[in-house]
Amino acid sequence: MGFLDLPFMLKAFRFRRLVVEDGKRRKKKKPLWLTPVSHGYYTVDRLSYADNSSNDDSVFVQREQQSDELEIWLFGVSNAGTGKEIVKYMQNHLFDKLPNELGIMRKCKETMRRAYVEEERTGGSAASVMVVNGEKLAIASIGDHRVVVCKDGEAHQIRDRKASTKHWSQFIFPVCNQGEEEDESDPRNSELVVITEKINSDTEFIIIGSPGIWEVMKSQEAINLIRHIEDPKEAAKCLAKEALNRISKSSISCVVIRFG
């Protein structure tokens, strides 16, 4: 009798294993929010000064989540008026037709590049960051607005990878060119840069800052100043206040995006 029931038992075992494996596959499809995203921003109000009223910044923060598996954050700082046009373009060409997760980064990069084309023609200045599912970044900048990523306490300024390639003279005469790599006033910064990269375990936070931040402090200075501040709102306020204390002449606005 036991031998007669053996085929049935084998079928039941196969069915049970199939259900378990299918359950595992379904669990893998669920999004894992391993990297929480928090943010804060601060703008120094200079409307009372007539000579600075034309240099005010626009700060924009927008979150889009159309499904349980796709969340997009858009952060940015730009010249007044520029930010509105960038966000408007994003809304019309990305947020209303979000692709699936596989094609989202390519779509983000293409849309950001097109959104910045007009600013590139008119000499506008802006910087923005897209955070997709707390796992990937799409970053764009043009002009004097800058994006700096903190990785294990070190500042990484976003630049075009091709433009950042060393010239042959830097290998032959490293001493003579030692200061060139650290020159943050490089004219190449005025060119449009759009890149994508992953958020790794060493990615701590991101600073998006206006010219008023960067004309009075280096990228590493800004990182060192706020790295110990866990609240991104307080970090952004601290950074802006420090720029003001250093008598920055340009507009002062910043966004701090913290991971984990």
From Swiss-Prot:
The record ties this protein, via PROSITE patterns, to: PPM_2
Domain of life assignment: Eukaryota
Q: Where is the PPM-type phosphatase domain?
A: 41-259
Q: Name which cysteines form disulfide bonds.
A: none
Which Gene Ontology terms cover its molecular function?
Answer: protein serine/threonine phosphatase activity
Which family, according to UniProt? Belongs to the PP2C family.
**What is the protein named?**
Putative protein phosphatase 2C-like protein 44
